[in-house]
Amino acid sequence: MIPKKIIIMAGGSGGHVFPGLTIARYLIEKGWLVNWIGTKNSIESRIIPKYGIKIHYISIKGLRNTSLKNLIISPIYILRAYYAVKKIIKTWSPDIVLGMGGYVSGPGGVASWNCNIPLLLHEQNKIAGITNKWLSRISTKNMQASPGVLRNAEVVGNPVCQSIIKVPNPINRFKNRTGLLRVLVIGGSQGSSILNRILPEVSFLLKEKIIFWHQTGNYELEKTKKKYNKLRLNQNLITSFIKNIASAYEWADLIICRSGALTVSEISIVGLGAIFIPYPHKDKQQHRNAEDLELIGAAKIIDQSNLNTKLIVNILNSLDRDKLFIMAKKAHSLGVRDAIFNIFNVINKISKKT
């Protein structure tokens, strides 16, 4: 039997790349051949090749918060990227092209449509990004993590890796747990400057109550470590990137983090109370992602403009392990654990029509 082939388009941020990688690895297990389209010097260029997946690089940038100069020359980059992806499609002849949202998906989505290759989209967020909004008008099939985001889209959930799904539930994790409250701090795959600045101060004021496992991002590791060391806070674990995030979730009583779609999905699947500081996009995309968990009492949302040391200290002082256990159970009730199977069924069904 000739194996099916798929091109996955995702790049720029972990929120697009990691769900795409989960899908890619599952498809490979099922005998599919996978190629990837991304950009150089970005998260996908560092991660995807490690899994033996061939990645093709295109030159394209996002338009959000860009300069006037970049806006003027952006059509040139888009056109070049379009022809680059079209050449890849013509050469490799995939059965399916899957766009995970973000600027990397744009040129390839149009190229696949122009080449009459089925275009599938997956939207992770509660508010669709610009690229997926545009491409949803020409796509063969739309998938979404939550209802009502893209037109005529099937709700499938967000795919997460099996190691996260296998994390013990809150009842088993919190059983007989004692000692300092364990707080996981993650600013997304790139880290977060504001959390790196504030959390050492919080740790100093609550050093008798809290221990942090803090992901700083690659660029601020040494700077953040110096802040902790200056305050003589040696009990905390400070790292640039947590490779085994499942073990970190299993360890934690609470997480302080951004509210990217994948992070929110993972927290729900694991069952973990959260303090969310949404990235302040104009469309409040991350705020919307976190609202369901806040609504059921599993999380608190703090706008970045209101974030300060005193506020975090007051919230943490109001919590104990019993309260965090209740928050964790509430979060666990919203977890979607079969997303990868739902997505595979959609891909497989469309591929049989080609």
Swiss-Prot record:
Entry keywords, A to Z: Cell cycle, Cell division, Cell inner membrane, Cell membrane, Cell shape, Cell wall biogenesis/degradation, Glycosyltransferase, Membrane, Peptidoglycan synthesis, Transferase
Main location: membrane
Signal peptide bounds: none
Listed Pfam families: Glyco_tran_28_C (PF04101), Glyco_transf_28 (PF03033)
Membrane topology term: Peripheral membrane protein
Any one GO molecular-function label of the UniProt entry: UDP-N-acetyl-D-glucosamine:N-acetylmuramoyl-L-alanyl-D-glutamyl-meso-2,6-diaminopimelyl-D-alanyl-D-alanine-diphosphoundecaprenol 4-beta-N-acetylglucosaminlytransferase activity
Cited InterPro entries: GlcNAc_MurG, Glyco_trans_28_C, GlycoTrans_28_N
EC number, as in UniProt: 2.4.1.227
Domain of life of the organism encoding this protein: Bacteria
GO cellular component, one term: plasma membrane
Protein's cellular compartments: Cell inner membrane
Chemical reaction(s) catalysed: di-trans,octa-cis-undecaprenyl diphospho-N-acetyl-alpha-D-muramoyl-L-alanyl-D-glutamyl-meso-2,6-diaminopimeloyl-D-alanyl-D-alanine + UDP-N-acetyl-alpha-D-glucosamine = di-trans,octa-cis-undecaprenyl diphospho-[N-acetyl-alpha-D-glucosaminyl-(1->4)]-N-acetyl-alpha-D-muramoyl-L-alanyl-D-glutamyl-meso-2,6-diaminopimeloyl-D-alanyl-D-alanine + UDP + H(+)
UniProt keyword annotation of Zinc-finger present: no
GO BP terms: carbohydrate metabolic process; cell division; cell wall organization; lipid glycosylation; peptidoglycan biosynthetic process; regulation of cell shape
Pathway(s) where this gene product acts: Cell wall biogenesis; peptidoglycan biosynthesis
Binding site for UDP-N-acetyl-alpha-D-glucosamine: S13, G14, G15, N125, S189, I242, A261, L262, T263, V264, S265, E266, Q286
Family, as annotated: Belongs to the glycosyltransferase 28 family. MurG subfamily.
Function: Cell wall formation. Catalyzes the transfer of a GlcNAc subunit on undecaprenyl-pyrophosphoryl-MurNAc-pentapeptide (lipid intermediate I) to form undecaprenyl-pyrophosphoryl-MurNAc-(pentapeptide)GlcNAc (lipid intermediate II).
The name this protein goes by in its record: UDP-N-acetylglucosamine--N-acetylmuramyl-(pentapeptide) pyrophosphoryl-undecaprenol N-acetylglucosamine transferase
Organism: Buchnera aphidicola subsp. Acyrthosiphon pisum (strain APS)
